Design a protein with these regions (language model features):
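Bacterial signal peptide processing site
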Residues: 18-21
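A short acidic-to-branched-hydrophobic micro-motif
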Residues: 58-88
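Short, well-ordered beta-strand elements
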Residues: 126, 130-138
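Sec-dependent signal peptide recognition
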Residues: 2-8
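Surface-exposed amphipathic alpha-helical segments
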Residues: 137-197
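Short Gly/Thr-rich strand-loop-strand
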Residues: 24-53, 83-123, 157-181
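Short, surface-exposed beta-strand/loop micro-motifs that present aromatic residues
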Residues: 56-67, 114-115, 120-127
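C-terminal motif of bacterial Sec signal peptides marking the signal peptidase cleavage site
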Residues: 14-16
Length: 197
């Protein structure tokens, strides 16, 4: 009986402490040196995809240094209606941003796209099922590892070392642009291979 009780308690602790998705999709708590500041729900998303409606959720975090200077980091979680082809669609959109250099980076627990702006701003983005997660750094700083780790534990990256969705992930599939270039027929996102039925 003791062994059963111990196993039950261990299971409850293990699964009870797991990374379940927060009700408003972002972490509304302090993370590392950054203190949670505020939440905002947004309808004007950064990567609109035709035929795949989405809503955004953002959280701001603030850090004060010993000289009372403040730094602000941001996390943005966009939730799309479905995951099919999401990684390819987002990658196409990111490649079209002329003001950013894009690369793929090992973020520890998974791969992410790194966007670096001419003004020194840096962002890590990745796709996790039907969600796109974007974590931004204070100007001139690296993206805070604690924030990336916290969000990556909630939203594991679907990306591989080349910045494409790993085979078998829900966000895998060909983008609309790539299908057109390959001579494929124009299909709405909901009818593409891998779309939920």
């Amino acid at each position: 009986m003791k062994r059963f009780t111990a196993a039950l308690v261990f299971g409850l602790v293990l699964f009870g402490c797991g990374g379940s998705v927060p009700p408003r999709y972002v972490l509304e708590r302090d993370v590392g040196d950054f203190r949670y500041r505020r939440y905002q729900h947004v309808l004007d998303i950064e990567v609109p995809i035709e035929g795949n409606a989405a809503q955004g959720h953002t959280a701001s975090y603030i850090r004060r240094d010993p000289n009372d200077q403040t730094s602000i980091a941001t996390a943005f979680v966009t939730v799309y209606a479905h995951a099919a082809s999401l990684a390819a669609e987002v990658a196409d959109s990111l490649r079209s941003l002329n003001s950013y250099e894009m690369s793929v980076q090992d973020a520890g627990a998974g791969y992410a796209w790194m966007l670096q702006g001419a003004s020194g701003d840096k962002w890590l983005l990745w796709v996790s099922r039907e969600r796109v997660v974007k974590v931004g750094a204070p100007p001139g700083e690296d993206v805070p590892e604690d924030l990336v780790d916290a969000y990556m534990s909630l939203y594991p990256s679907d990306l591989d070392e080349h910045g494409r969705a790993r085979e078998g992930t829900e966000s895998a599939g060909t983008s609309h642009r790539a299908s057109e270039e390959a001579g494929g027929e124009e299909l709405p996102a909901s009818l593409r291979e891998g779309a939920p039925r």
